[in-house]
Amino acid sequence: LYEAGFAVLSEESGRTGPDGEVAPTHVVVVDPLDGSTNAALGLPWCATALCLVSNGVPTVAMVANLRTGTRYTAVLGGGAQRNGHPIIAGSMERLEDAIIAVNARPPATFRPAQYRSMGATALDIASVAAVGGFHGTIDFDEDRIGVWDYLAAITIVREAGGVAADALGRDLITLDHNARRRPVTAASQGLLDELLAAGRSS
């Protein structure tokens, strides 16, 4: 990537570029192993996530399950795919009917139809992009999620017609290695609004 003139942003190395310099135009945000605890335990919910950010805009994204080979991809303006087939987010509107992936323990007042804590943020979010996956995701933790954990996945969700926001209203698109966010995603705006309300009250 450096030889091609791309900078790289990852949790382990920070933001680096060719010959140690940061390339300002194209940055690849990468998480080589999302869900490392799951991987160590042999659980089939871990992934590699990549997102190309050009001039501050996410343009190409991929989240690949390292155990099953399932691959979610998206190109800006070109929609989203799973294993090469077009996908769209579902139409779930109500939290009480939804199955939600959560990060950290939810409060007792959080009452979707069901929730799961799967341990791999990128895969949790990417699954929202396709009917049959989670209806939404929410992070109840205190700002521990880095951009490498979610940027590729929210790009895929948005291209599939889903929606994403930060629980505290901040921009999710950042190339600051020290920035942390609380991403919330959903198949529909109505469900996102309910999830954001739940996040604010936690």
Which stretches of residues belong to each language-model region?
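Residue-level signal for inorganic ion chemistry
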Residues: 1, 36, 65, 74, ...
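N-terminal subdomain of lithium-sensitive/metallo-dependent phosphomonoesterases centered on the IMPase/IPPase/PAP
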Residues: 1-33, 196-200
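Short coil/turn connectors at secondary-structure junctions
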Residues: 4, 22-25, 42, 55-59, ...
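General beta-strand structural signal in soluble alpha/beta enzymes
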Residues: 7-12, 30, 39, 117-119, ...
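Well-ordered beta-strand scaffold positions
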Residues: 13, 78, 85-86
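DPxDG-like acidic metal-binding loop motif
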Residues: 21-77, 81
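An extended, acidic
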Residues: 87-202
